[in-house]
UniProtKB/Swiss-Prot annotation:
NCBIfam families: PRK00110.1, PRK12378.1, YebC/PmpR family DNA-binding transcriptional regulator. This is Probable transcriptional regulatory protein GTNG_2524. GO terms for biological process: regulation of DNA-templated transcription. Residues 1-14 have a biased composition (Basic residues). It holds the Pfam family TACO1_YebC_N. Disulfide bonds: none annotated. Its main location: cytoplasm.
Length: 247
């Protein structure tokens, strides 16, 4: 994990999503709908809904869109049955890729994901073929331009709040937590006046793969193709972010 800033990759993803804001809001609405349908429409009593609402707010999703998705899930109208499916495989150069989907048509989604891999130099694998290369973690990113704090001061606050570790780059402080302690750490740091450029539970690669030339171009095209699919919620990979920011 050390030495591999997540902030550049998050910025790249946010910039790409800004260009496709309507699609991003649609995917977030679907995630909110599923969380509310499965666990109820009260965020205080539904941790999954609470987390995705935070994610939606961080993406500047309008409050009325959030409320609409919750009402749709908890109302009396006919409901859509979405199923979460995870695909695992390898991109060009052996980059590990995990794709998280929410779909109401497994056959359509499987065909689209398989096509994205095959057309961009990758291949789908069996369940579990790459998941062992990732670890589920809470990640809180603080933009250093927004907070004039010393690294040691913030590290102490993070540890006292229950964080596991913190990494520092020129642009950001990146605080890692267990999934279980994520909300507690976030709330305690917010009470100290901190705000987050990104706050999510994500999959962190344990090893990284560096690509260049045509392999890198194909890998970036694979990521873009997958993220552009309406059924795909998240794409996790272990491509070294330092090469992404140069593109």
């Amino acid at each position: 994990m050390a030495g591999h800033s997540k902030w550049k990759n998050i910025q790249r993803r946010k910039n790409a999503q800004d260009a496709k804001r309507g699609k991003l809001f649609m995917k977030l609405a679907k995630e909110i709908y599923v969380a509310a349908k499965n666990g109820g429409g009260d965020p205080a009593a539904n941790p999954s809904l609470r987390l995705v609402i935070e994610k939606a707010k961080a993406a500047n999703m309008p409050g009325e869109n959030i409320e609409r998705a919750i009402k749709k899930a908890t109302g009396n109208q006919e409901h859509t049955n979405y199923e979460e499916i995870r695909y695992e495989g390898y991109g060009p150069g052996g980059v590990a890729v995990m794709v998280v989907c929410l779909t109401d048509n497994k056959n359509r989604t499987a065909a689209n994901v398989r096509s994205a891999f095959s057309k961009n130099g990758g291949n789908l694998g069996e369940t579990g073929c790459v998941s062992y290369l990732f670890e589920r973690k809470g990640l809180l990113v603080i933009d250093r331009e927004q907070h004039n704090m010393e690294e040691d001061e913030l590290l102490l606050l993070a540890i006292e709040a229950g964080a596991e570790e913190m990494e520092t780059t020129d642009e950001s402080f990146e605080i890692y937590t267990t999934p279980e302690s994520f909300e507690t750490v976030k709330e305690q740091l917010e009470q100290q006046g901190l705000t987050f450029a990104s706050a999510e539970i994500t999959m962190i690669p344990q090893t990284y793969t560096t690509l260049s030339g045509d392999e890198l171009k194909k890998m970036l095209k694979l990521i873009d193709t997958l993220e552009d699919d309406d059924d795909v919620q998240e794409v996790y990979h272990n491509l070294d972010e330092s090469v992404i920011e140069e593109q």
